[in-house]
Amino acid sequence: MQQIVIGTAGHIDHGKTALVKALTGTNTDQLAQEKARGMTIDLGFAYLNEQITIIDVPGHEKFIRNMAAGAANVHIGMLVVAADDGIMPQTKEHLQILDSFSIQGGLVVLTKVDIVNDEEWIDLVELELQALIKNTVLNGAPIIRVNNLTGDGIEAVKKHLLHTAKEVKIQIRSNEFRMHVDRVFSKKGFGTVVTGTVDSGELHVGDKLELLPNKVDAKVRGIQTHGGNVDSVGVGDRAALNLANVERTEVYRGTVLSNPGIIAVTKKVIAHIIMYPDTDWTIKNNQRIRLHIGTAEIMGKVSMATPKLKKGENGSVIIGLEISLSVACLLYTSPSPRDLSTSRMPSSA
C-alpha cells in the first residue's frame, strides 16, 4: 500500500497550519512555544487518510532549515499564500526548495480571501502567482481560493490532493533500508523513538540497524505508522521507530538509519550547484557555507575551478564537510540561514 507525503510551503502567518487543521482536524502546532508564539517552529504531522501524511513546515526565515528537512521526502507540494499579503520572501524561497526536490505535483492555496474586500486585488495576486510558478514544478497547478470563515474551498483542496496522490509514482532506488531522522524523543516505558520518511528498502520489527555517522548499533523494538502499530514499513512510509540499545543522546535530526554496513560516511562530496536567477549573493572559492543534507544541517567549505558562482550560473564543486556525514540525497547550501541554493549530487548508497 503506497504511502504519500504532502508538504506545505509558504510565508509565516499565511495560514498553513490552519489549512492543515481544516483538512485533517489536527492542530500540528504541538510545542508549547509554538502555541504561545502563534507560529510553527518545527515540523508538524497530520493524516489526510490512512495513506497520506501532511507535513506542516515553519514559514519563518529563521526556521528554513526545518522546512528543508521536512521537504526532503515530499511527493506533493501545497504552496500556501495569504490573499491579503500576496507573494512574500518565504513564498519564493519555499517554492525554490519544492522545485529542487522535483515533487510530482501539487497546488497553490490562496487563503484568507474572506478578509480581502477587493476582488480585483485577489485576481491580481492570482495572476502574480501564475507568473511565479511558471517554469517550476508547480507550473500549471490549480490555484484554489479558501475562505477561512466559511470553509469554502477546503473540499476542492482535499479533492485535488486525493486525485494527485493517485498519480504519484514512488521510485524504488534501492532494496536496502535507509531513513533520515527528522525527530527524536524519549517516551516513558519505551525509550528512544525516532521518526522519518523511509527513503528506500523495507524494515521489520526485530531488524538490526546502524545509526550514521556515529556508527551506533540498534535493534527495532517497535514500529508505528499513521498512529498504529505495524510489523513493517517500506518506501514512502512515515514511520516512528522504537529503538533498543540506543541512548537519546546517540541519535539526532540528521542521523541516517540503514541496514548495517551498506552506507559509508564521508567528509568530502562532489556536487553540482545551481544558483537561482533571483538570488542576491555569490558563492566564492574556499567560502564557508551552510549545508542542508537530507535532514541534517552542517557547515562546509567550497572548492571549485572558478573564482565564484554568480546568480543564474551553475557549476561542479567539491565541498569539504566539517564533520563526517552519510550522504545519499539532495543537499542545500546557504551562506546564511535565509539564503538557499540547490546542489544536486549522486547517491552514495
Model-derived segments and spans:
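Conserved catalytic-core segments of large NTP-driven translation/proteostasis enzymes
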Residues: 131-277
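GTPase G-domain guanine-specificity segment
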Residues: 113-137
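Switch I (G2) and immediately adjacent beta-strands of P-loop GTPase domains
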Residues: 30-76
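Conserved small/polar residues in nucleotide/adenosyl-binding loops
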Residues: 332-339
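Basic, glycine-rich polyanion-binding accessory segments appended to enzymes
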Residues: 258-328
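Conserved Switch II/interswitch segment of TRAFAC-class P-loop GTPases
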Residues: 73-92, 104-107, 113-121
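Conserved G1/Walker A P-loop phosphate-binding module
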Residues: 1-33, 44-48
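Conserved nucleotide-binding/hydrolysis micro-motifs of P-loop NTPases
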Residues: 60-61, 84-87, 112-116, 148-152, ...
